[in-house]
Amino acid sequence: MRFICRDLGFDTGFNYKETDNYEAKLKELCPNGIDIYFDNVGGPITDAVMRLINTRARIAVCGQISQYNSDQPDVGPRWFGQLIIRQAKVEGFLVHQFADHYDEARRQLSTWLREKRLKYREDVVEGLENAPQAFIGMLSGDNIGKRLVKVTERTYSARPGSVGEEVTVG
């Protein structure tokens, strides 16, 4: 929690592995309810959130990782009634829908990175031979930040036309 509160500026948060009563924890942390929810998890956490949404809440659904490897995926949303009562808006979110903005986004994000306005953490695992365990660990949540596998050191050749060199053809 220190990382998300101190480094990223969130007011609060919780580790889903440290409680089995998500609704109680969310009520404690969000006593006035939830206005905005970015859902890439699905399952019991989303069920708990939906019981606490405020009137005209907005929900972006990007993924359902809790369901990806399930032998018996959840049967439909049990919270449609809440959406109606709370007049909430749910919209699917795919990054590809913004493909025509990629160049502009890359420029802006690069600027923000240089200015240190965007914060991130990388969790680097050394060696391709460790990739399978790194992937499994990522799916089980044993990392903080972006999980990367470092395959090799990057080296450059002194030959003209090699990676990293600019060649002018006259």
Please place each PLM-identified region on the residue numbering.
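Terminal helix/beta-alpha structural elements that buttress the NAD(P)+-binding lobe
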Residues: 1-170
